[in-house]
């Protein structure tokens, strides 16, 4: 499904955590679909490698990407980001909130306050600051699309021990995304989705599950086509969860 209409202006897509893993795969897939990708990550070198790969895919378009090296704990920089995007393009069509940190897998009473604060800052507060900064631009799009990467750790019936900080942050992100979907569904063309990628071959997964054979896991590139679909103008669902392992769209329901 094409992200940008042939002959029309490219859709502008911001991807956080774009230097590796799911974010990198999403950035490349969006670029292949014709979008201009604003790639945000902390690591300048990895962003430049991403830029080189996208340039190789679109050799006649030397400016198919814009690199935005940024630490998402720098909230003032997030506040400036929306203004910078508005000055250049006057809108934002796609926001993929992918960046996240695992933190330390340890009992809650052993967790350092700084570790807790870092997990919440990146996984929750940064996404709220991004919504706050980007909402005016998404409303200026004819089809603003937002996709946040969540985790089954937030909603498993049997909560996993030692994952408290990460699970709490993703549960908060779920609520944040659903609230934003409810706020925008009748007042804009914005549609908001949560995506559970499941177990993929990423650095975070390797850190969390060091004994797992990565060859048994699916690659992030397998998810990227669905991210492009969810971020396309044709997508109409909002406030729901796309579960990649089961390939299903799930609605949130209160317990019976």
Regions found by a protein language model. Name each.
Residues 190, 194-195, 202, 210-256:
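C-terminal helical subdomain
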Residues 139, 143-186:
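Catalytic loop of short-chain dehydrogenase/reductase
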Residues 33-49:
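Conserved glycine-rich Rossmann-like NAD(P)H-binding loop of the short-chain dehydrogenase/reductase
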Residues 98-105:
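Conserved NAD(P)H cofactor-binding loop of Rossmann-fold oxidoreductase domains
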Residues 19-21:
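Conserved glycine-rich cofactor-binding loop
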Residues 45, 69-80, 113:
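The beta1-alpha1 cofactor-binding region of Rossmann-like NAD(H)/NADP(H)-dependent oxidoreductases
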